[in-house]
Amino acid sequence: MSHDADDKTYPYRKDDAELRRRLTPLQYEVTQHAATERAFTGEYTDKEDDGIYKCVVCDTPLFESGAKFHSGCGWPSYFKPLNGEVIDEKIDYSHGMVRVEVRCNHCGAHLGHVFEDGPRDKTGLRYCINSAALNFESRPEND
């Protein structure tokens, strides 16, 4: 699923050549062509440090570590984004399924998907996010 046919315009304009230079091949494929990293291989799947997870493309803060939980799915999981304005959701019909794709609302980078099987005592949602789409910024006490 490529973003090439999308009609939404995002505030941050990405230069493809610059992205190819700056991102790893996996980061590029995940964020620009909606690829999925293999389960249990991502850098942030088991990370428990206190901090903020940001978009690897535009550095927009997306998720707080306090919203992260162990879902057992093999990808970092969060029960809510930082706020309601940082995430764009779009119906995804790829691979013979109907899912809700999650993108950065600032640059349109593919992040992952959101499912309704998260912690019931929180939001009931599970934002299943590719580590390759994220950068982590630890809070000063973790340095």
Swiss-Prot record:
- Per the record, what is one GO cellular component? cytoplasm
Catalytic residues as annotated in Swiss-Prot or TrEMBL: C128 (nucleophile)
As to how many cofactors bind and how, the note says: Binds 1 zinc ion per subunit. The zinc ion is important for the structural integrity of the protein.
**Any single biological process term in GO:** protein repair
Q: Where is the MsrB domain?
A: 16-139
Q: List, in alphabetical order, the Gene Ontology terms for molecular function in this entry.
A: peptide-methionine (R)-S-oxide reductase activity; zinc ion binding
Q: Which PROSITE patterns match?
A: MSRB (PS51790)
Q: Which cofactor does it need?
A: Zn(2+)
What family is reported? Belongs to the MsrB Met sulfoxide reductase family.
Name by which UniProt lists this protein:
Peptide methionine sulfoxide reductase MsrB
Record gene name: msrB
